[in-house]
From Swiss-Prot:
Domain ClpX-type ZB: 1-54
Domain of life: Bacteria
Keyword Zinc: yes
Pfam family, one: ClpB_D2-small
Gene Ontology MF term list: ATP binding; ATP hydrolysis activity; ATP-dependent protein folding chaperone; protein dimerization activity; unfolded protein binding; zinc ion binding
Binding sites annotated in the UniProt record for ATP: P118, T119, G120, S121, G122, K123, T124, L125
Protein name: ATP-dependent Clp protease ATP-binding subunit ClpX
Primary role: ATP-dependent specificity component of the Clp protease. It directs the protease to specific substrates. Can perform chaperone functions in the absence of ClpP.
NCBIfam families, A to Z: clpX, PRK05342.1
Binding site for Zn(2+): C13, C16, C35, C38
């Protein structure tokens, strides 16, 4: 291809119809012409299509330290759990990327993870942040809604359907996703006596979960619900899906204490009881999970167990202020949109944290506590002219005093006087 001489006449771009004197360059092919403007436009179109055709999802695997750094942006504390999770996830996806002909015949098995910790300690947030960091589909399921085949409730395949939906029905993407199953402790067998008839929400569900945890090709109804004859099913391979199982496991500390008191030389039951709860949970072993009610086969499919600590006042205060999506930052931004400055005193943050601990809701309950304190302010301030600053004190959180409202001159404003 070449550029025609400028003295050529009646030459036009075959695409846009512009004359050669209307463009900078006119390039000729076999009986056709294209101008520089159309070349640039075509180049942009090709680049966009190539970008769209590139597979989404995990492209470059971050190192455990990089995963840890991302978790630190959103999850405060729980250092041991985050480190265990970062290593487990890195090894899992390293295994996924290396699948193929294996010359040394070493088979790398899945590394599903169990997160054990009280309500509001960050189990779900850890799993969500992992999926976001790795740019893979993510789905959450509640184990209490699952039943074994033949009973009213959700089949375990419906867990996979949620992941497929999160991947916009792209099976290749879904097969590299993460599924978080919450309340896994609720499907524990109610007795260690294996001769007892299986209960609908207990051992039977564990048995049903075994295959998809290990890796199998599952048939999933595209509309959810039970399978029906002549129904077209979606096939999905679960071999490379990472399962993160979460549960509070209330009472498992007593199981661990019994084991420490009976089996560890030099420990009596009274000595074992001296451990605080978090220290006890650090001693958790697979046999403790079995004593709690998980069957050995199920425990074997989840080789990595990470313990999350109970969040104290200082940890909850950090959660309120430090993460990128910290609640204090969010509410401050919301009032800022109404040209109002929002401040929380340190005592207010402590009061919020103490109230969450008292309610036994952990970090999960922080938002509702702040919402209770701010609901009237967020209702009144948008229609108030004089208020430019709101200060939340400990008395506000404890329902003893209204928030402090200030005008532009720094004068304390009575709330009733500002209402429209």
């Amino acid at each position: 291809m070449f550029k025609f001489n400028e003295d050529e006449e009646n030459l036009k771009c075959s695409f846009c119809g512009k004359d050669q004197d209307q463009v900078k360059k006119l390039v000729a092919g076999s009986g056709v012409y294209i101008c520089n403007e159309c070349i640039e436009l075509c180049s942009e179109i090709v680049e966009e299509e190539l970008a769209q055709s590139e597979p989404e999802g995990l492209t470059e695997l971050p190192t455990p330290k990089e995963i840890m750094d991302k978790l630190n942006d959103y999850v405060i504390g729980q250092e041991k759990a985050k480190k265990s999770l970062a290593v487990a996830v890195y090894n899992h996806y390293k295994r996924v990327q290396q699948l193929g002909p294996n010359e040394d015949e070493v088979e790398l098995q899945k590394s599903n993870v169990a997160l054990i910790g009280p309500t509001g300690s960050g189990k779900t947030l850890l799993a969500q942040t992992l999926a976001k960091t790795l740019n893979v589909p993510f789905a959450i399921a509640d184990a209490t809604s699952l039943t074994e085949a033949g009973y009213v409730g959700d089949d375990v395949e419906n867990i996979l359907l949620r992941l497929i939906q999160a991947a916009d029905f792209d099976i290749d993407k879904a097969e590299k996703g993460i599924i978080y199953v919450d309340e896994i402790d609720k499907i524990a067998r109610k007795s260690e006596n294996t001769s007892i008839t299986r209960d609908v929400s207990g051992e039977g569900v564990q048995q049903a979960l075994l295959k998809i945890l290990e890796g199998t090709t599952a048939s999933v109804p595209p509309q959810g619900g039970r399978k029906h004859p002549n129904q077209e099913l979606i096939q999905i391979d679960t071999t490379n899906i990472l399962f993160v199982l979460g549960g509070a496991f209330d009472g498992i500390d007593e199981v661990i204490k019994r084991r420490l008191g009976e089996k560890v030389i030099g420990f009596s039951s009274s000595e074992a009881s001296k451990y605080d709860e978090d220290a006890i949970l650090e001693q958790i072993r697979p046999e403790d999970l079995q004593s709690y009610g998980l069957i050995p086969e199920f425990i074997g499919r989840v080789p990595i167990v990470a313990n999350l600590e109970t969040l104290d006042v200082d940890a909850l205060k950090n959660i309120l202020t430090q993460p990128k999506n910290a609640l204090v930052k969010q509410y401050t931004k919301m009032l800022e949109l109404d040209d109002v400055t929002l401040e929380f005193t340190d005592e207010a943050l402590s009061a919020i944290s103490n109230k969450a601990i008292k309610r036994k809701t952990g970090a999960r309950g922080l938002r509702s506590i702040i919402e209770e304190a701010l609901i009237d302010i967020m209702y009144d301030v948008p229609s108030s002219d004089g208020v430019v600053k709101v200060v939340i004190t400990a008395e506000t959180i404890n329902d003893e005093k209204e928030p402090e409202l200030y005008d532009k001159d720094g004068n304390l404003v009575n709330k009733e006087q500002t209402s429209a």
